[in-house]
Structure formats: C-alpha cells, structure tokens
C-alpha cells in the first residue's frame, strides 16, 4: 500500500513462533490477501519470542500472568518494526498500551474446552487421585469444582508439547481449547468436548485479535476489512467483565457472550483456585449494551464475593 509495485510488502505481522500462533497469523494473512485481492506473500510474518515462550519452568501466574505472551510483540509494534500483531484474544491483557488498540477480531472459532486422556473417556471417568495437567488456573479450579478427588498440576508448553506430555504419562489427562486443535488440524485428539454450561471458557477463547497502533490509519483500514462485528460485540462484553475483576492470571475467571441478532446472552464466573468457592451470573440485553452488561456482571460478582475473595488469591 506504500507503492503500486505488485511485489512490495504491504504490511508486516508480528506473532509468536508456536505452531498455533503461526497458524493464526497465516489465517489473518490469507483473509487479508483475499479481502484486498493481493498475493499473500505481500504480507510478511515476523516471529517474536515472548517471555511466556522463554519461561517454561514455572506457572504463568508466578511470573506475571497475562501479558507474558504479548509484551515483546507490543514493543515491536510500538517501535515500528511490525505493522500489527496477531494474538489469541485470551492472551491479551485487558489494559493495552495507550498507543495501541484492537481494531479487528476474526470470526470466532469454537469456544469450548476439550478433555484429552488415553485412560478415560471423560473427566467423570477418571479414577480418584488421577492427575489432570493444565497451566490454566481456570481449568484447574473447574476440574477441582467438578472432581475434588482429582489432583491437578501445571502442564506448560504449546499444544503439541502438551499432547506429547500426556502420551508419555506426565499426567493422566489434560484440557485444551478446541479452537486451537481445530486450527492445527488436531481435533481428532479430543477425547470429549466440554459444553460451556459445565465448563465455562476463558474470556476471548477461540477469537483471534489484531492489535495495531491507534494513529496508523492505513493499517487500521487495512485490517478492519476482515473484522467480524459479532465477535467484536462478544469480546466487548467479555473484556469489560474481565477488566473490572482481577484481569491477571491469579484469579480463575470464565466468561462467554453469545450474540443473537441484536441481543446478547452473557455468562460470567469467578472461582477460587481450589474450586470450593464460586460465584456465577448471567446477563441478557441489547447488543449495543454489550460492554455495559459485562461490566454490570463484574460489579455484581465483585460485590457478592467481597474484596477478601480477590485479595486472598492475589497473594497465592
């Protein structure tokens, strides 16, 4: 777009280098190429190693929580070495640098989690004392809520690494996002899909977000061509809900918004890490009020749980 030369690079995407992150970046690139009728090769992809990729020996909530998978990419964006970033929405902090924003989300993939185990057909089929490996506090807490007789431990790594760890017995089972398996062509690895009414997904799960500089009119117009309005509405409710709670990785939080025409249905949950204390709420309302409904749901749960609920786990 800086030149009429058909071989010039139009824009550079910044992304993590994991297979899933690269699959997401290529999906964005291909959609942009179709929307603007240009060769995909004219949109470059630059991989950036993040803190979350480098630190594999500790749980995320012990080393900074959210932002670990975006910080270095945002730094490249602000420095101008990339034109926009592609993220998994659930990795994006609720508060962005002042100079950046999320101008577009791709159409949302399946939001559900999946149960994976070589030993059992479902979470309920695992024997007492079996170990479920997951680095997600939300998943750990919900496993313990449903099956307090199970053990949970941290299982880090990209999708393929976690699948390998399960296959060699580092845990009896794990939980992953179905969206990630679908994007990698690994959906056949799912033992059982967990419905949202029993296992509420993470805020933003299944949605690919594009982050750009607010003042870059050229790039903002470029990426908005592939934005999905329904996903944007759903994420506005979910992210406003998260922003008013503990938006780090220290408090297990689930949230999911469904968009039905000009109406939305939202469900939100906060839960203690051991699964014994939880608060849930729902909201229905106009699509135009999505952000306000998410915020209202958060205010209700914060009031019901009390500040002690959040301060107790902030230091956990």
UniProtKB/Swiss-Prot annotation:
GO terms for molecular function: hydroxymethylbilane synthase activity. One of its GO terms (biological process) is protoporphyrinogen IX biosynthetic process. Belongs to the HMBS family. SUPFAM superfamilies: Periplasmic binding protein-like II, Porphobilinogen deaminase (hydroxymethylbilane synthase), C-terminal domain. Monomer. The modification S-(dipyrrolylmethanemethyl)cysteine is found at residue 249. The porphobilinogen subunits are added to the dipyrromethane group. It comes from the Bacteria. Binds 1 dipyrromethane group covalently. The keyword Kinase does not apply. One of its GO terms (cellular component) is cytoplasm. The gene is hemC. This is Porphobilinogen deaminase. The keyword Secreted does not apply. HAMAP family: Porphobil_deam. NCBIfam families: hemC. It comes from Nitrobacter winogradskyi (strain ATCC 25391 / DSM 10237 / CIP 104748 / NCIMB 11846 / Nb-255). Its EC number is 2.5.1.61. It catalyses: 4 porphobilinogen + H2O = hydroxymethylbilane + 4 NH4(+). Tetrapolymerization of the monopyrrole PBG into the hydroxymethylbilane pre-uroporphyrinogen in several discrete steps. Pathway: Porphyrin-containing compound metabolism; protoporphyrin-IX biosynthesis; coproporphyrinogen-III from 5-aminolevulinate: step 2/4. Keywords: Porphyrin biosynthesis, Transferase.
